[in-house]
Amino acid sequence: MHSTWQPAATIKQLKQRADILNQIRQFFVERNVMEVDTPAMSHATVTDVHLHTFKTEFVGPGYAHGQPLFFMTSPEFHMKRLLAAGSGCIYQICKSFRNEENGRYHNPEFTMLEWYRVGFDHHDLMDEMDLLLQQVLKSGTAERMTYQQAFIDVLGVCPLEDSMDTLKQAAAKLGLSDIADPEQDRDTLLQLLFSIGVEAKIGQQVPAFVYDFPASQAALAKINPNDSRVADRFEVYFKGIELANGFHELDKPQEQLKRFEDDNTKRIEMGLSPQPIDHHLIEALKAGLPDCAGVALGIDRLIMLALGYDHIDDVTAFPFPRS
């Protein structure tokens, strides 16, 4: 049976969405941040073990055997190539794709705002993002806490120092023993504790910025020069929903390449296929990435929260079931 042809969101809701997108663009115009447009597909993709990509194949002239292509999970790699080419501060509002969940807060194809500020570190970027959130959400000044403090305050355990057994005991108190007890990977266990135990307890009245994530979860962020246990990475939560993920961007090509290779090793150990590494990005880092910070923000979730709805379908014209 076919689903209805009509949009999930009303025209009134879509006009409200358009108004917020205009607000966001004006925010960056006022700060002289250039809007850019990068490919939705690439020959390479992310290696992160927690991200699942859509894959297709180009079979045009010169590619009789097919050229694998991946839909981008974010525009990060292409935008960093622009930064290395001298673009200066840039932002993009685009479609991103993740072959994962479909539901209240997830759609396989979603709208992302990503921006990079040359000369900023992650604290500077949190300051700027706080201003944007106050404007769009009509919220107060965000609260800030380290990843370590969030765990200690909410769960009574230290994510940087406590043993796996202690972390599993915390999971047991949340009724997660069946998932946590067999888990051997520390970061997977920490992410379980954070998503189930911490997220719902922070950022209820105003958005919460959580920063200084474990170095093992650095992804594309720099390691903190004053504490090698943590990375210059932050995430943003509001009313139990993850809104954004930001970095003081890593600019060392060999370290970034090693992280990608380590991810692929981990993927193989987990029974997942290794992913093709984006060597264009590595070459761009070799050419020189300016000191900068960047963040990716989920637009659909932001608009849903700003307008007081409880499902992203309420602010999306044609979500996955109707697409």
From Swiss-Prot:
Query: What PROSITE patterns does the annotation carry?
Result: AA_TRNA_LIGASE_II (PS50862)
Q: Which InterPro entries match?
A: Aa-tRNA-synt_II (IPR004364), aa-tRNA-synth_II (IPR006195), aa-tRNA-synth_II/BPL/LPL (IPR045864), EpmA (IPR004525)
Broad EC category: ligase
Q: Which UniProt keywords apply?
A: ATP-binding, Ligase, Nucleotide-binding
Tell me the residue numbers annotated for binding ATP.
Answer: 98-100, 107, 242-243, 298
Record's Gene Ontology CC terms?
Answer: cytosol
Q: Which parts pass through the membrane?
A: none
Write out the GO MF terms. Answer: acid-ammonia (or amide) ligase activity; ATP binding; lysine-tRNA ligase activity; tRNA binding
Family assignment?
A: Belongs to the class-II aminoacyl-tRNA synthetase family. EpmA subfamily.
Cross-referenced HAMAP family, in alphabetical order?
EF_P_modif_A
What role does it play?
A: With EpmB is involved in the beta-lysylation step of the post-translational modification of translation elongation factor P (EF-P). Catalyzes the ATP-dependent activation of (R)-beta-lysine produced by EpmB, forming a lysyl-adenylate, from which the beta-lysyl moiety is then transferred to the epsilon-amino group of a conserved specific lysine residue in EF-P.
Q: What is this protein called?
A: Elongation factor P--(R)-beta-lysine ligase
Organism, by scientific name, is Vibrio atlanticus (strain LGP32)
